[in-house]
Amino acid sequence: MMFRLTSVSCFLLVIVCLNLFQVVLTRRCFPPGTFCSRYLPCCSGRCCSGWCTRRCFPRFGKRATFQE
């Protein structure tokens, strides 16, 4: 009887620990200079073009030129 009670309590303890780890890992954030996305947020600053930065700067691409 004691073995059964101990194994059940250990099993429940493992379930509780796994739930706590899931909450901690899903609520983590990333420092500036690391990859980010909508589901992986930055700790401070913003997610600009997939990278955590303090400020977002506009990026200008190459303009198309007409050739005659």
UniProtKB/Swiss-Prot annotation:
Stretch forming the signal peptide: 1-26
Keyword Signal in annotation: yes
One Pfam family named in its UniProt record: Conotoxin_I2
Disulfide bonds, paired cysteine numbers: C29-C43, C36-C48, C42-C52, C47-C56
Residue numbers of Phenylalanine amide PTMs: F60
Chain positions listed as propeptide in the UniProt record: 64-68
UniProt keyword annotation of Secreted present: yes
InterPro entries from the UniProt entry: Conotoxin-I_CS, Conotoxin_I2
GO molecular function (one): toxin activity
Tissue spec. comment: Expressed by the venom duct.
GO CC annotation, single: extracellular region
Keywords (A to Z) from UniProt: Amidation, Cleavage on pair of basic residues, Disulfide bond, Secreted, Signal, Toxin
Top-rank taxon: Eukaryota
Protein location: Secreted
Domain-related comment: The cysteine framework is XI (C-C-CC-CC-C-C).
Family membership: Belongs to the conotoxin I2 superfamily.
Protein name: Conotoxin Eb11.7
